[in-house]
């Protein structure tokens, strides 16, 4: 098989630790019973009976759309205008006052992949937290890109100093930065940056952007599972303070929000 693939990529077998732990959880359930084992690897919403939740409001609405309407092509490769407008309103509401564009993608991972492929050239470096979804690193590897990791935590707080230091080193080497933040509800820790942490983060990015273009990718896959839905998007008001050499890409996914994991419906909101 390797004879048919790219030569200049990492051909190491992909080992997903989540699936291996999930398999161990399933085996433990057989031995100890489901009441004695908590499988915390499931990235999906399940009910108290252990069944996958498919929100009735979502799928009743989806099923009411005529088949021909669902089957036909979108009006443009970047998605239908009504979809793109709906995504922007859902993601940003009235919090962001910046010029923006929305690109439809195959799930939130499609938005992440698009950014990694389009922002960085081969051989350049992606900045990631040391605790993160493993597919970020995989996507970089498939584009022949490197990764540098910042320490996500300083005690029980976001480690801004490590983030800035890592980004500065990358900026000095390649003249631009693409850094990923998975917030709110970071996977796998569940951590959400505070309002003050976001203010300091944007201020630091603005300073770094004086040396070259800075792109921040905010993966919001779990945003609608935040503790307070009324305020969980308030941090986005800080986006209004970005400098002219800063771009923010918000990776939106309907998978978690609308319990539509297999629908592969997402978007990149570019600010």
Specify the residue positions occupied by each region the protein language model found:
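Catalytic-core helical/loop segments in enzymes performing group transfer/polymerization on anionic/lipid-linked
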Residues: 3-5, 165, 238, 266
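Active-site PLP attachment segment
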Residues: 236-271
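Short, well-ordered beta-to-alpha junction loops that form the rim of enzyme active sites
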Residues: 42-43, 184, 220-221
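Hydrophobic pocket-lining residues within nucleotide cofactor-binding pockets
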Residues: 45, 152, 254
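N-terminal small-domain helix-loop-helix segment of the aminotransferase-like
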Residues: 2, 11-107
């Amino acid at each position: 098989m390797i004879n048919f693939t790219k030569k200049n990529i990492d051909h190491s077998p992909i080992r997903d630790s989540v699936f291996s732990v999930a398999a161990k959880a399933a085996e433990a359930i057989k031995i100890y019973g489901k009441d004695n084992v908590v499988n915390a690897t499931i990235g999906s919403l399940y009910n108290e009976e252990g069944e996958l939740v498919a929100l009735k409001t979502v799928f009743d609405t989806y099923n009411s759309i005529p088949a021909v309407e669902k089957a036909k092509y979108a009006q443009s490769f970047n998605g239908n205008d009504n979809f793109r407008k709906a995504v922007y309103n859902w993601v940003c509401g009235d919090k962001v006052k910046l010029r923006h564009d929305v690109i439809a993608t195959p799930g939130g991972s499609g938005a992440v992949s698009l950014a990694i492929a389009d922002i960085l050239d081969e051989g350049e470096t992606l900045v990631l937290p040391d605790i993160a979804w493993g597919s970020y690193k995989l996507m970089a590897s498939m584009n022949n890109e490197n990764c540098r990791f910042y320490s996500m935590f300083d005690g029980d707080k976001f480690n801004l100093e490590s983030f800035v230091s890592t980004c500065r080193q990358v900026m000095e080497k390649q003249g631009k930065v693409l850094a990923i933040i998975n917030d709110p509800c970071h996977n796998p820790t569940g951590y959400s940056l505070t309002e003050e942490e976001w203010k300091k983060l944007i201020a630091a990015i603005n300073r770094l952007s004086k040396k070259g273009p800075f792109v921040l990718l905010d993966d919001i896959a779990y945003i609608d599972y935040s503790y307070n839905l009324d305020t969980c998007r308030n941090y986005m008001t800080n986006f209004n303070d970005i400098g002219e050499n800063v771009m923010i890409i918000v990776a939106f996914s309907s998978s978690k929000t609308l319990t539509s994991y297999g629908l592969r419906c997402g978007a990149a909101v570019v600010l």
